[in-house]
Regions:
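An N-cap/entry alpha-helix motif that binds or orients negatively charged groups
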Residues: 1-23
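Conserved radical SAM core fold
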Residues: 49-50, 79, 84-87, 114-121, ...
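Glycine-rich anion/phosphate-binding loops
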Residues: 53-65, 90-91, 126-129, 166-167, ...
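Short Fe-S-cluster ligation motifs
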Residues: 64-83
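Generic structural signal for well-ordered alpha-helices
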Residues: 64-67, 93-98, 132, 170-173, ...
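Conserved glycine-rich "GG(E/T)P / GGGxP" loop and the immediately following alpha-helix
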Residues: 78-103, 120-124, 193-197
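Conserved C-terminal portion of the radical SAM core fold
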Residues: 104, 137-148, 167-211
Length: 211
């Protein structure tokens, strides 16, 4: 009931700002790897580095093979997100974005979450802004909202203790906005969090929107 009421309020604001318009797209998903340096408590499919024999780590050519499978379909977007591994670094994704745009320029690239970017940019010794600007020049168009989970440290420390912090997650999105990129956000709820943790999460997102 509370969620439904929240949806009514959200729709009121949406209609006030955008009128009676709704956006749909046709996308496909590429998950470059299910191997991950992080050990989130809720993740049931990823494999740690020490378990990588049970997982997969794609190369750029393999990712492009997936893109090419959709050559004769009216897709509008490729959505890329997965685990975090050292070999899939800044230049790995720069190479893929370039090749993807060269092959199909009109295809919108919604790529990677702040969790991946925080790790990649730290390894590359780049600021969030400079890293995103570089990848934007390679073809990145927008950013998905995964990895937000629950922002409050009381919960985040228990379920995803080694991921980027809420502040780092929000800053990466803020830098993307400064570059003119659109982003979205998620919230993982229904586990150990309380209602006020959800409110805190959405309030932080609203504050970022207000900026």
């Amino acid at each position: 009931q509370e969620l439904g009421y929240l949806g009514v309020l959200a729709n009121y604001i949406r209609e006030k700002r955008h009128g009676d318009h709704t956006f749909f797209n046709r996308n496909f998903h590429i998950e470059p790897t299910n191997v991950c340096v992080y050990d989130c408590k809720f993740c049931s499919y990823s494999r740690l580095i020490k378990e990588r024999a049970e997982g997969w780590e794609m190369e750029v050519d393999g990712m492009m093979d997936i893109v090419k499978k959709y050559d004769n379909e009216a897709v509008t977007e490729v959505h890329i997100t997965g685990g975090v591994v050292p070999k899939q670094n800044l230049e790995f994704y720069a190479d893929f974005f370039r090749k993807c745009k060269a092959h199909r320029p009109e295809l919108h690239i919604k790529g990677l979450t702040p969790v991946e970017y925080y790790y990649i940019f730290k390894k590359a010794k780049l600021s969030h802004y400079d890293g995103l600007k570089y990848l934007q020049s390679c073809g990145l168009d927008s950013m998905p909202g995964g990895g937000a989970e629950i922002f409050h440290p009381e919960v985040r420390e228990q379920i995803a203790h080694d991921k980027c912090t809420a502040e780092q997650w929000l800053d990466i999105h803020e830098q993307a906005h400064k570059l003119g990129m659109h982003t979205n956000a998620t919230m993982l709820y229904g586990h150990i969090e309380q209602f006020w943790h959800r409110v805190d999460h959405m309030e932080r997102l609203r504050q970022l929107q207000d900026k």
